[in-house]
Amino acid sequence: MEDSLLEIMTKDGGDMPAPLEVSTVPAVGDVISGEYNGGMKELMEHLKAQLQALFEDVRAMRGALDEQASHIQVLSDDVCANQRAIVSMCQIMTTAPRQGGLGVAGGKGSFPSVPHEPETPSPGIGDSGLLGRDPDEEDEEEEEEKETASPATPTSHCERSESPGLLGENGPLVEPLDLPDITLLQLEGEASL
């Protein structure tokens, strides 16, 4: 039959018909691959933008943390300074009574006249404590004391003025500034007895 058709066509003097043009249809795999690649590209761009924003946030948080760390360091220095001040104050408070006691003891050594004044002996005790006295002189002085001063209210000035250590044979009274030394001599004489 094909041979008969060819013969008819050749008899008519016609040319051979041209082959039909077939339009190229994209394969399904190519379509899926293109869509996948496009979607992945958009997704990567979105993730990149999110990561960039996250990096900016982390950088800002790091700056804030550095500022907080410097503030904490300042507070820590203040706390350490306050702690050292409290420790030094506690040391001063604990050692202050001891220093005061030493000061009182030192005051006794440097100012002997002040604490020894209340311990001034009575006329009888003080006169008996002096060395190198005769019994006759003691009797005469006791009589003079009874005449000049009341025994109920003797004064320290009268007691010291009647002491033979303060009077010369016919001379004036010893100056009041020398009285503490005489008192010390009396106490030392009593201690030696």
Curated annotation (Swiss-Prot):
InterPro entries per the UniProt record, alphabetical: DUF4677 (IPR031458)
Compositionally biased region (Acidic residues): 135-146
Protein name as it appears in the record: Coiled-coil domain-containing protein 184
Extent of the signal sequence: none
UniProt keyword annotation of Coiled coil present: yes
Coiled coil ranges: 39-68
Annotated Gene Ontology cellular component terms: cytoplasm
Keyword Signal annotated: no
Region listing for Disordered, in residue ranges: 101-176
Keywords attached to this entry: Coiled coil
